[in-house]
Amino acid sequence: HAQKQKYIEDYNFQYCDEASKYEKIAKIGQGTFGEVFKAKDRKTQKKIVAMKKVLMDNEKEGFPITALREIKILQLLKHENVVNLLEICRTKATLSNRYKTTFYLVFDFCEHDLAGLLSNINVKFSLGEIKKVMQQLLMACIIFTILHRDMKAANVLITKTGILKLADFGLARPFSFSKNSAPNRYTNRVVTLWYRPPELLLGDRNYGPPVDLWGAGCIMAEMWTRSPIMQGNTEQQQLTLISQLCGSITPEVWPGVDSLELYTKMELPRDQKRKVKERLKPYVKDPFACDLLDKLLVLDPSKRADSDSALNHDSLDRPHALRSVKMLAQHTQSMFEYLAPPRRPGHMRPHHQQAAVINPTAARAQQLLRRKWLSRSSILVVAFLLLSTPALCCL
């Protein structure tokens, strides 16, 4: 037993430095993926990094497949608008940690995430700055043969110089169009509920890049409303909110939707008219931006705007990069969702979410639970991840 312990202590992981080379400064994130820390290089005392702890749910099964996939994808995706993986570090196995090595993914540090910025009432994005954020987000999407599958404001990092970095590829996977008429069988247990597109909510497993474009549309709208525009508590409720905003989900507007697994099992509101422009107009002052949102938040994924057409849309003409740098330079304190107070319920709620509230008592209960929703949402995603792991094939 003593020999085994000594072997574990002395074992050297090639190409994997010890995590002790970095000094943790503060915890800046926590979720289904584990924890994220701001840290600095002990040697230089200057270089700042982000360290993402790999969550070992079941160490008997070895290194998590989701972490392996994330590492592989990040090694392939070297792009200005994708977070940069610097290295993988590990702690030394000793008696004090029960001979369990902890691994960290080490990234270039980004000062803010979009959810944290939107939580701060003192951060005000101009139209040009919103254009610049969306242009960079769509640039991150257009390069992919990858499905990100977790588009949300908290996963959009922004540096102090205004450069956007898409982060958290823990649910991402390589994408290819189905061959020989055999459909893909991807898991639909992905994407945080408030940003999940209707095809996934209805059980589609043969999906593609449009799932990320729906999330991009939700993020774009959120930059004006300052809160997620559809805040359902269940998959059924999320579909109701989508129907109330985008119109009834029927084969007439979405051919083939009735063949999806959950189409007949969900209660889908009837006689709902499409109201995307009507609902967003009070917040989105630019008519071109409102038109782009109308093209991104489309029920039928085959009719949803793709990254290329969205980038060429009139609404993204002449974004103001320098202005966003000046705006962010005014805020020296980092802003992350984890460190921010809960955002108030979205402005959109009174307009198109009334049907989701059953009675005043339920409404009050929802208000009381609102502050706990982020943690509840994280628990849901953990459950989805655990349920779907067998379906997530290796690269």
Q: Which positions does each model-derived feature cover?
A:
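Conserved activation segment of eukaryotic-like protein kinases, specifically the C-terminal portion
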Residues: R185-L200
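Conserved alphaE helix
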Residues: L68-R69, L76, K100-Y104, D108-G162, ...
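Conserved N-lobe ATP-binding subsite of Hanks-type protein kinase domains
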Residues: E35
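Conserved N-lobe beta3->alphaC-helix segment of eukaryotic protein kinase catalytic domains
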Residues: K47-I48, K53-K78, A93-S96
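Intrinsically disordered, low-complexity regulatory tails and linkers that flank structured modules
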Residues: P319-L395
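Conserved HxN/HPN-centered segment at the entrance to the catalytic loop
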Residues: H79-C89
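C-terminal lobe substrate-recognition/regulatory segment of protein kinase catalytic domains
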Residues: S248-D294
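Activation segment
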Residues: L171-R173
